């Protein structure tokens, strides 16, 4: 006996409001559901196609669709003869030059194997040993010393001092890229994600990490990097390594509606019956205003609210699209309870005081010192709580201006 499917009430197989990144290797979240961003997509592809190597950056607020855009660009490049893999390379906040170089080498190695499973030869052997050693050691600096001989098959694993990867890695990376180009690849495209993880504590250190491997690893012919993050446009040091970032603006409301329609169609349960939208258009319009471009937050709000409301519906009932009043009431109660539980009394009261001024307002720490009548360290601590709870986000700094903070759609729904 099949289990109940709430979304079947609308002739849908599952929730159309998933927040997972679209991927080329996923049937559940395929790239064919991608909508909009044609100008940005073409700009990124043109830069790749016009250069022997490239370093591009995509910036924008959290949840706006940066990662999915780059996944789509990778698929486009793959179709044009470039090699890539479906993996997204994370950048660690506590990484070092060696670790970042190792991640790049691993990404190129994975791309080679994904596109040429029978790859062999000294270049591949050398990369394989280095990558395996890095992964077995959890990214540590125990690497292989490569023996001399035909095919490079003679090797001995030895523990090397810190910095060994910086000595061997660039050569192995260069040779592996040449191998790929010699096998017909027009280049290799890698996706580095979440530059904010590298930059949030110290922008100059982030730039030092990137500059530290730029000449050794980032400039090789055939290597095309696209780095994604929320902060790349605000740090000139990082921009000295990558091109001027492509800053994404929110999808227009019409594109969001198109995105939802594509998902409804893709998830149609019974082809003999039409699907029905689970939510009325005014609901999407209202949430679009509240979340101000945060598509991930908008989709999560729709999924949370509609799932809760559908749970009260009898199986087999003729269900109309969820209306605005019902959804807002459900989300207000849900978000309010969750935030109060996470924040505690003091931080919650300060969030309410901010909302009473204007929930859509941007505030600096100096303004919040005056609003909350507390000292700056207390404001900083409260903001950290609010950010961790998903109630507030810090906007990218503009030059030397003070950082501005904004209440998220999740918090605005609760207040």
Q: Can you name each region flagged by the protein language model?
A:
Residues 373-389, 402:
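Short amphipathic alpha-helical interaction segments
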Residues 46, 50-188, 192, 198-201, ...:
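P-loop NTPase nucleotide-binding core
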Residues 359-371:
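Short acidic, hydrophobic short linear motifs in intrinsically disordered regions
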Residues 328-350:
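Short alpha-helical segments that sit at the start of domains
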Residues 397-415:
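Short, cationic-aromatic polyanion-contact patches
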Residues 265-333:
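Amphipathic alpha-helical "lid/sensor" segments that cap RecA-like P-loop NTPase cores
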Residues 2-7, 171-284:
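The catalytic "switch" region of P-loop NTPases
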